[in-house]
Amino acid sequence: MADGVRAVVADDSHFMRSVISDILSDGGIDVVAQARDGEEAVSAVIEHRPDVVTMDVEMPVMNGIEATERIMAESPTPVLMLSAHTDENADVTFEALDKGAVDFFTKPGGEVSMEMSRLKDQLVEMVSSVAAVDVGATGSRSGTGSDSGTAPTTAGGSATDRRGTGGSSGQTTYVANPTLVIGSSTGGPKMVEQVMENLPIEADLRVLIIQHMPEGFTGRFAERINTRSDYEVQEATDGARIGGGEGLVAAGDRHMEVKNYRNGRLRTKLTQDEPVNSVRPAVDVTMQTAAETIDDPLVGLILTGMGEDGADGIRRIKQAGGKTIAQDEATSAVYGMPKRAAETGCVDTVLPIDDIADGVIDTITTEVT
């Protein structure tokens, strides 16, 4: 997978540069340059034209956020942020994603050399996946941002036409008590935010989001979605309950199960059971328990990500009578999870990211007769 990948490693710590470079080299990745700060990283990218950059967040002269912004403006290259596991770094890491970084990998605390060695396979796999991203082609954000409160338009008419206020032929209305389960991994945070920004509150969805992300970051991620969408979104806690117009983000290092469902409200349970598909939280866990528990309309959505997590969950949702959607290859940062889901034969619709919110709405509307 890593054969032929060329990387620049940027970190102000000589020790960390050496550890990261050795891990990548042992994994078959050619480290063409190392950089001590953001300015050196920008110069190295322009000179060497690598396939990927691993970028520390806090560096002298120019930090990782500024360097990422410069790289995207001057020589667009996939950037993987390497962030310390702190609340402060969570904030700046998400800022780097806003500037164009594809994803992030958390550097361990404690005995770094031992921990990095333990995580070496994950790091090599993630660097290789990020290197394959076409940063100029994926993740369009048209129709988001300042337009986040605007109801999207679909083939059945605008969402404002679906509120059931009219009875003329051709109008549609939302089904009662729909639930949406979203799963994503590499490259997913921006994609999830885009989908959520474009879901109208009138749809009254219950939304469960599983993004492969460590502790310390999922809370910040939930806050960002809450700010940018019309839905009330928070990080899941054990026993949390939500109804229409509300959402939960699975907490880092915890599986999120749907424990029970009654009268349009669902309750979640968090566990530290063994990782599923080598990850925790796992999309499959939430989708499978949702399919078993929820007896109202259910939609499963798989966005960009590496691996196969979510494929079995999509199968379970389809078998339970739910609707299923996967992101297309052209707009996925990494076409792993959506591909595996589609290969099950249980995906109803494959859509580009800009059409997914509309696609979700199409699954939860019905024509008024």
Curated annotation (Swiss-Prot):
GO terms for molecular function: phosphorelay response regulator activity; protein-glutamate methylesterase activity; protein-glutamine glutaminase activity. Residues 173-367 form the CheB-type methylesterase domain. GO terms for biological process: chemotaxis. It is an enzyme of class 3 (hydrolase). It is found in: Cytoplasm. It comes from the Archaea. Keywords: Chemotaxis, Cytoplasm, Hydrolase, Phosphoprotein. Its EC number is 3.1.1.61, 3.5.1.44. It catalyses: [protein]-L-glutamate 5-O-methyl ester + H2O = L-glutamyl-[protein] + methanol + H(+); L-glutaminyl-[protein] + H2O = L-glutamyl-[protein] + NH4(+). Residues 138-159 have a biased composition (Low complexity). Contains a C-terminal catalytic domain, and an N-terminal region which modulates catalytic activity. This is Protein-glutamate methylesterase/protein-glutamine glutaminase. The lineage of its organism: Archaea, Methanobacteriati, Methanobacteriota, Stenosarchaea group, Halobacteria.
